[in-house]
Structure formats: structure tokens, C-alpha cells
Curated annotation (Swiss-Prot):
GO molecular function: peptidyl-prolyl cis-trans isomerase activity; protein folding chaperone; ribosome binding
Job description of the protein: Involved in protein export. Acts as a chaperone by maintaining the newly synthesized protein in an open conformation. Functions as a peptidyl-prolyl cis-trans isomerase.
This protein's record includes keyword Isomerase: yes
GO terms for cellular component: cytoplasm
Name of the molecule in the record: Trigger factor
Organism: Mycobacterium sp. (strain KMS)
């Protein structure tokens, strides 16, 4: 087999392939043997019919089509392997010569990773915000802790923000009842914004037993995106009384004996979260600088595929109704033109980022170990509330393991970039990046650090209230 590569653009090539007919003869032999097992000819046992009779029955052209159809993908892969081409996406294959007894000739046009001139990584200077902790932030954490230990007491007055109410809901669309939007005895914190838009405004000022109608747009179900008239009835109103922030409360809500010790712990908790946020800012700034300093040719078909995927996801929940989608955008103060422009900008940035990270990974010779993949799998399984083995099966079934591998490699790459850069805060102080981006931990250390801060926060919450549960993200994986 012979193959040559033509460069059509910085991001696209045409691979020309010639396969001698002699290389296809074993494929014809196998095809006829399989056919002989399936076709019964008078006077011959199954699998023993002569090839000429089989050709006469099926037709030589039909067999040629079958053999060529089965041979081309493998020959394309062989041609790619023998070249330095790094394909992106699926090729567009055109068979230019296909005759029995003659060489098979075809071309394959495919997007490829472009050649990228990378910046001097040692000259990269990253500046981020310093870590500053205010009394107000610590007080917010303390207030949240007090709220978890608050008690609810019934009140005889109109509802206001912060109250806990029991409500009945019903809705109609175009005068018809919406069964899935009907519920009774639903508990809701007024002002939380956790249910449908407009509900909190409708509840404020209502007394026990009073009802009110309001108009809103349904976000889910078969009527998603449609305007509905919702009726809310307040069944009961309770207010939350908070415990005093004293030593007794500290002993109740934590492992500490005094309120001062508890505040010190909350201060450190805020600091841990801010360290993670600073690490995320460092990572984002590093990527931003790299994108600014690097010219990356974009393969249009890959960009368009990303755009198509985003559009599909956006309108899938609306049964691909373009008119309803346009109405939804208008309600959000946007338009289809603005949506399309933003989608293209985001797709181009995403593709540019992936190509840049892959080029950097090659230059830095970033290797992904089994431990890196295992750590990412464990981290993701904790995030989605699944067992690691269960998540692994989901990823395998959806052919997502290569994408996870690429994502881990890119994470390790940006960590290596950060570790080699000069990193300061806006006050001019050097920032030690080894906690999240160190050479021994790489990108996984950052991920683990962020997760560790979340875990610490959850542990603190567990000492605050036994009734809290956090499983919202599990549904995303399921």
C-alpha cells in the first residue's frame, strides 16, 4: 500500500491511498468463504460451492463493494499511522478507483492538529488577587451555622423573607390544569428562590389560609418554556429563631469549648476555600495568558461540531421547537443572533484551548499515569454520588474514557505550566503554588485540594446539623 499526504490548510489534509489488488485478494477469499456458508446451491454441500458460481449468483460488483467497504477503514488507519498526521474527527473518504483486478484508490480529507509555535513558558508572569479574609465573611459562616441549629416557631402574621411556609401549588396553561405542577404541603423558605420564578414575591404579605395568583414560565415538564398561571395558598407560617453565639452554642455546634475557638476555625475554613479559589484563578489566568500569546489555527469542522452540539443541547428540552427557543431567549433579554454569536465565540475558545493544551503536553512530555486516572475517577464519583466502578462502567458505555484521559492530561499540563511560571499577587508577594500545582502532585493535587476543602466544609457542616444531605449532583451522572 502507498499513501501520500497533501496539506490543504494548516488544519486540514488530504491523504491519497493506493492499495494493490493483490493485498485485497485475501479479503475476497474470506468474503467468499463466508458467502459460501450462507448461500445454498443445488448439488453442493454448505460451504463447498465454487467461487465462480457464487460470483454468478451474487455478482462480482456486489462482492467488490463489500470487500472495499470493509477494507477502506483499516487502510485509512494504516495510512495515518505511517504518517505524522494527527487527525481530529472523522475523515471524508472518496473512492476514486474501484475495479476488480485493479488497484483500489481513495482519498481521505480530515482535520488535523495544526503546528503551533508555543510561547516561552519560563517568561510567563501570573498575577492574581491576594487572599483577604474579612470579619463579615467569618460572620456569614457563623450565621449559617446558627441557622442550622435554629428552631422554627409558628407565627400569626403575614409571611416575609426568611420565613418557612407550607404551601399548596396549582397551575394552568391556556386554561388547562398542569397535573405535574400541582402539589400540597410543600415546605419552602421564603426568599430562597429555590422554586419557580415569582413565587417568593407572591408569598410575601400573605397570611395563613390566603391565596394569590401569579404568572410565570414553566422550566420543566411537557409545558417547559410556556407561560402558566400559578396559584399559591399559604397553609402555615413559621419563623426561625437563632441560638445566641456564645460558648454554649460553640459546644453544641462544634468540637470547640468557646465561641472564640469556633470563630478561629471558621476563619481557617474561609481561608481554605479562598486558597482553592486563588488556585483556580491562577489556573484561569495562566490559560488566559497562553491563549493571548499563541496563534492557534482553528479547524472549522471541529468548531462547527462543537457549535452544533451546544445548539442541540439548548433546544433538545424544547422538542427542537425553534420558535419556543426564540421566545425563551427573548424572555432572557437575548436573541438567536446573539446566542449564535456567543456560541461560536465559546466554541472557538474551547477548541483553541484543547489544541493549545495538547501541543503543550507534547512539548512538556506530560505523561498520564494509572494513578492520575484513578484519582480523577474517584474524584468524579464523589462529585456525582456514585461508586467508582459504577461511574467507570458509565464512561465505558458512552465511550468517554478517551475524553477523560485527554482532560486529565490537559490538567496535568496546565499544572506544569503554572509550576514553572512566576506567580505573584497584586501586592507583589510571591505565591507558593506547590500546594495545588506542585511537581509531585500536578493537576490532580489541585483537584484534590479543592475537593479536600469541600470535604472539610462538609465535615464542619456534619457537626452543625445531622439533617443535612448533599446529593444534588448524582442525578447529572444518572
Amino acid at each position: 500500500m502507498k499513501s501520500t499526504v497533501e496539506k490543504l490548510s494548516p488544519t486540514r489534509v488530504r491523504i491519497n491511498v493506493e492499495v494493490p489488488f493483490t493485498e485485497l485478494e485475501p479479503d475476497f477469499d474470506r468474503a467468499f468463504k463466508e458467502l459460501a456458508k450462507q448461500v445454498r446451491l443445488p448439488g453442493f454441500r454448505p460451504g463447498k460451492a465454487p467461487r465462480k458460481l457464487l460470483e454468478a449468483r451474487v455478482g462480482r460488483e456486489a462482492m467488490l463493494d463489500q470487500v472495499v467497504g470493509e477494507a477502506v477503514p483499516g487502510r485509512y488507519t494504516e495510512a495515518v499511522t505511517s504518517s505524522d498526521v494527527q487527525p481530529l474527527g472523522q475523515p471524508e473518504i472518496e473512492i476514486t478507483k474501484k475495479e476488480y483486478g485493479e488497484d483500489l484508490v481513495f482519498t481521505a480529507e480530515v482535520d488535523v492538529r495544526p503546528e503551533i509555535t508555543l510561547p516561552d513558558l519560563s517568561a510567563l508572569e501570573i498575577t492574581v488577587d491576594p487572599i483577604e479574609i474579612t470579619d463579615e465573611e467569618v460572620d456569614t459562616e457563623l450565621q449559617s451555622l446558627r441557622a442550622r441549629f435554629g428552631t422554627l416557631t409558628g407565627v400569626d402574621r403575614p409571611a416575609k423573607d426568611g420565613d418557612f411556609v407550607s404551601i399548596d401549588l396549582s397551575a394552568t396553561v391556556d386554561g388547562k390544569d398542569v397535573p405535574e405542577a400541582t402539589t400540597e404541603g410543600l415546605s419552602h423558605e421564603v426568599g430562597s428562590g429555590q422554586l419557580i420564578e415569582g413565587l417568593d414575591d407572591a408569598i410575601v404579605g400573605l397570611s395563613e389560609g390566603e391565596s394569590k395568583e401569579f404568572t410565570t414560565t414553566l422550566a420543566a415538564g411537557e409545558h417547559a418554556g410556556k407561560e402558566a398561571i400559578v396559584t399559591v395558598t399559604v397553609k402555615s407560617i413559621k419563623e426561625r429563631e437563632l441560638p445566641e453565639p456564645d460558648d454554649e452554642f460553640a459546644q453544641l455546634a462544634s468540637e470547640f469549648d468557646t465561641i472564640d475557638e469556633l470563630k478561629e476555625s471558621l476563619t481557617e475554613q474561609v481561608r481554605r476555600v479562598k486558597r482553592v479559589q486563588q488556585a483556580e484563578q491562577i489556573r484561569d489566568k495562566a490559560l488566559e495568558l497562553l491563549l493571548e500569546q499563541t496563534e492557534v489555527p482553528l479547524p472549522e469542522k471541529i468548531v462547527q461540531a462543537q457549535i452544533d452540539d451546544t445548539v442541540h443541547n439548548a433546544i433538545h428540552g424544547l422538542d427542537h421547537d425553534e420558535d419556543r427557543f426564540a421566545e425563551q431567549l427573548a424572555e432572557q433579554g437575548s436573541s438567536r443572533e446573539e446566542f449564535d454569536a456567543n456560541t461560536r465565540t465559546e466554541a472557538e475558545k474551547a477548541v483553541k484551548t484543547q489544541l493549545l493544551m495538547d501541543a503543550l503536553a507534547d512539548q512538556l512530555e506530560v505523561q498520564v499515569g494509572q494513578g492520575d486516572l484513578t484519582e480523577r475517577l474517584v474524584l468524579m464519583s464523589r462529585q456525582y454520588g456514585l461508586e467508582p466502578q459504577q461511574l467507570l462502567q458509565i464512561l465505558q458505555q458512552n465511550n468517554q474514557l478517551p475524553a477523560m484521559f485527554a482532560d486529565v492530561r490537559r490538567g496535568l499540563t496546565i499544572a506544569a505550566v503554572v509550576h514553572g511560571a512566576t506567580v505573584k499577587d497584586t501586592d507583589g508577594n510571591d505565591i507558593d503554588t506547590t500546594e495545588f500545582f506542585g511537581p509531585s502532585g500536578g493537576a490532580q493535587a489541585e483537584a484534590e485540594g479543592a475537593d479536600e476543602a469541600d470535604a472539610d466544609s462538609d465535615a464542619d457542616s456534619d457537626t452543625e446539623a445531622d439533617s443535612d444531605t448533599e446529593a444534588d449532583e448524582a442525578d447529572e451522572a444518572k
